[in-house]
A protein has these predicted regions:
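Divalent metal-coordination and catalytic microenvironments
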Residues: 38, 43, 59, 77, ...
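Short, conserved loop/helix-junction motifs that constitute active-site signature segments
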Residues: 64-68, 136-140, 168-173, 245-247
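Hydrophobic/aromatic residues located in beta-strands of well-ordered beta-sheets
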Residues: 38, 72-74, 119, 143, ...
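Accessory, non-catalytic peripheral segments of nucleic-acid enzymes
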Residues: 216-337
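Active-site environment of divalent metal-dependent phosphoester hydrolases
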Residues: 2-5, 46-49, 75-85, 112-113, ...
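Conserved catalytic scaffold of divalent metal-dependent phosphoesterases
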Residues: 59, 80-169
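Conserved beta-sheet core of the metallophosphoesterase superfamily
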Residues: 151-152, 157-222
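Core catalytic region of metal-dependent phosphoesterases/phosphodiesterases
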Residues: 4-111, 170-174
């Protein structure tokens, strides 16, 4: 699992959504299947400078209290560290430290023996530790490597591939490499990004979220999908039967197609019903006939960043990837304002 608490500016609705996932799906699955070891691949808390007191209180009551009986290995992600250039000052050491016997913090690279399977862990790589950490990657004898990596060619968000990071060839000696950091679940060759365990923005609406279970006999992971979605996008169809309870306290976007000639008479009633649940946020987008034949069509089911990224590609400007990276960073930062 990776990237857990404090996203969306410590919004209490999102915090409750995150914690419900662990209480209702994650921990019950582990207990039912006799799993005793948990590995967290970084970004336990979202904010590098401080932790919201209510977030910490709820995490202590509803997450950390469930760790009894488990071994919880956690490496540092970039959001866990106060400075970008060193891991020395980090929230996990300062706040959690040795208060929980089940909680095992890895500030340095380490190798675990999981029922005979050798698994190497590498925390966030920065200027201060780069040489030592990369030397560990080049020389450790584990067949599986896990970390919090920025690897070239993998998507930060859909359509935006990372540049100026680590060369993927550095990891070719491992059977499998698993990483936190990037939000979208993705795989290429022997490298796999787990992605976030739950939806955080509308860009996640059509992405599969969840956690991964390691089979120590085969060295392979099984994906366990998180069935609880925070974001819902659909085209209104008065003949479709909706379970409106699925939308309670969720973010909903309804696309009303005025171009098809179909009846949309019931949309106002649906909006009233959803608001009375209530939903956390409701957006209605009406798709009208184009006024001009040459007017460009925009897929409004796509998220903001994907639309911007595609527009940058069409513009054919120099350093397009650098511009996408800047816009992505500004967008992510805006979510925490």
């Amino acid at each position: 699992v990776t990237r857990t608490f404090g996203a969306r500016n410590d919004n209490e609705l999102f915090l409750d959504h995150f914690l419900n996932f662990f209480e209702d799906q994650f921990f019950p699955y582990l207990r039912e299947n006799g799993i005793g070891t948990i590995i967290h691949l970084g970004d336990f808390f979202d904010r590098r400078k401080y932790v919201n007191v209510n977030t910490l209180n709820q995490v202590r009551k509803r997450f950390l209290s469930h760790l009894d009986g488990f071994k919880f290995h956690c490496i540092l992600g970039n959001h866990d560290t106060y400075y970008r250039s060193t891991n020395e000052v980090n929230s996990l050491k300062e706040i959690l430290g040795d208060r929980y016997s089940s909680f095992i913090l890895h500030e340095e690279p380490a190798t675990l023996d999981l029922a005979g399977l050798s698994v190497a862990l590498v925390p966030w790589i920065n200027k201060k530790n780069r040489e030592d950490f990369l030397n560990f990657v080049k020389t450790c004898k584990a067949s599986i490597l896990m970390g919090h990596f920025e690897i070239n060619g993998y998507e930060v968000i859909p359509g935006l591939k990372f540049r100026d990071g680590l060369d993927a060839r550095l990891f070719s000696r491992f059977d499998s490499v698993y990483s936190g950091h990037f939000h979208a679940k993705q795989s290429k060759e022997n490298i796999h990004y787990f992605g976030t365990p739950y939806q955080i923005t509308f860009s996640d609406a059509n992405l599969r979220k969840g956690f991964h279970v390691l089979d120590t006999e085969t060295g392979k992971f099984e994906f366990v999908e998180n069935k609880d979605r925070m974001f819902h996008v659909f085209v209104y169809d008065e003949n479709e039967q909706l379970n409106k309870e699925d939308f309670r306290n969720k973010y909903v976007k309804i696309m009303v197609d005025r171009r098809s000639g179909r009846s949309n008479n019931g949309v106002d009633l649906l909006i009233d019903e959803l608001n009375s649940l209530p939903v956390a946020n409701l957006t209605v987008v009406e798709l009208e006939d184009e006024k001009e034949e040459n007017e460009e069509k925009i897929d409004l089911q796509k998220d903001t960043l994907t639309i911007i990224s595609e527009e940058i590609d069409r513009m054919g400007i120099n350093n397009s990837e650098k511009l996408k990276k800047i816009i992505n960073e500004l967008y992510v930062e805006s979510l925490n304002i």
